[in-house]
Amino acid sequence: MVDGNNAKKTVIATGIGNAMEWFDFGLYSYLAVIISKNFFSQVDNDQLKLVFTFATFAIAFLLRPIGGIVFGIIGDKYGRKIVLTTTIILMAFSTLLIGVLPTYNEIGVWAPILLLLARVLQGFSTGGEYAGAMVYVAESSPDRKRNSLGCGLEIGTLSGYIAASILVFALNISLTETQLNSWGWRIPFLLGMFLGLFGLYLRRKLEESPIYENEQRELQKHPTREPIGVFTLIRFYYKDIIVCFVAVAFFNVTNYMVTAYLPSYLEGVIKLNGTTTSIMITCIMVIMIPLALMFGRIADRIGEKKVFLIGLGGLILLSVVAFSLMQLQSLFFVSIGVLILGFFLSTYEATMPGSLPTMFYTHVRYRALAITFNVSVSLLGGTTPLIASYLVSTTNNPLTPAYYLTVISIIGFIVIALLHKSTASKSLKGSYPNVDNEKDREYYEKNPEQALWWLKERQEKEKF
């Protein structure tokens, strides 16, 4: 049996890492202009400065798959806790590094080089962070509460972005432009380091996930089991990898469309004031927190597959409607358009952390999820702002981002409807059930075939 209260503490300790990742993401986005002035001052063109700044930002996405491979292997071999402790240390250090870096005027070309190294370190550590957090929470939560607890990781995402927005807004109204450009921009990054240290303090108190410990005991009984490489992993689990890749894709395309692309879209295309845009996006994210909690509970009751399809179906039908409302340039209708996207994004925020780890067996779960997740994010999620802005600039059609989102949602709907099997309230593949009450324990004792529902599938895939 697992302790429900300990599971909640686990969500908080792991969610802080996710909050820190998106706190950094938000800071870099909001402070991009100031960062470009400090680290690329030798570039005469302001637009080119921003290009270099965002190119440095994009480097992190290229390193995520490598981090996923390295930390995934470590996490499956040596445990989930050691990886989560390591990644948050690296994230805290890289955040501190950005906050204390000398500018180009002080050390010349070494300034952008060191900024690039800090972003490389962030990307590498992030590659193991989020997948590890999902795995750890899923393995530590009662099966019947996996989605409602797992969505706490995405609450961390929203909270980190909201905190970055509020902090940058506070600096803008409390400091002069000269102060902000000179030293004020460093404050949020220094505060981010303390957030990371607090997360490290909480994570050091965590125990290893019970499911991983059970797997290690089983491994001692079967010491001759051969290690599974990446190609063997693909061979045995290609269907699960496809479903996971597509799920991560439609989740992150929607996520980056709302969080990364919409601010610049509303300013550049819809011609809204920058401050108004920031406040609007922040308010929508605040609304998304209770929505994610609600959909997490619903997913535990009716199954995550149905909640996936609600989100996908809604975006297929209403993405164009949402972007069309934004074209009216009325603050009310623009807000409704953004809220529509945020509402359906909440269905993914609620279900992804608790569902993605269930697609793989315990002995390969960390590396399979880390590699698949980060490759999908790097190829499709992180490129969403670039693709959306390219579509608008080349077609002169402000609705093309909606068409892109619709196409991705249609693909997701087909894959989830045909290939995904709901695992809500079921035990994780390769493990015994996680229960937090006597009633469930007695049920599985009387119905062992329900407890080990995955056994037949595993026997067909592997020989032990």
From Swiss-Prot:
Record localization: Cell membrane
Family: Belongs to the major facilitator superfamily. Metabolite:H+ Symporter (MHS) family (TC 2.A.1.6) family.
Pfam families hit by this protein: Sugar_tr
PANTHER family, per the entry: ALPHA-KETOGLUTARATE PERMEASE
Membrane topology label: Multi-pass membrane protein
Gene (UniProt): proP
Predominant place of localization: membrane
Gene Ontology cellular component terms for the protein in this record: plasma membrane
GO molecular function: symporter activity
CDD domains linked to this entry: MFS_ProP
Keyword annotations of the record: Cell membrane, Membrane, Symport, Transmembrane, Transmembrane helix, Transport
Function: May be a proton symporter involved in the uptake of osmolytes such as proline and glycine betaine.
Name this protein carries in UniProt: Putative proline/betaine transporter
TM segment ranges: 15-35, 54-74, 82-102, 107-127, 155-175, 182-202, 241-261, 276-296, 307-327, 328-348, 368-388, 399-419
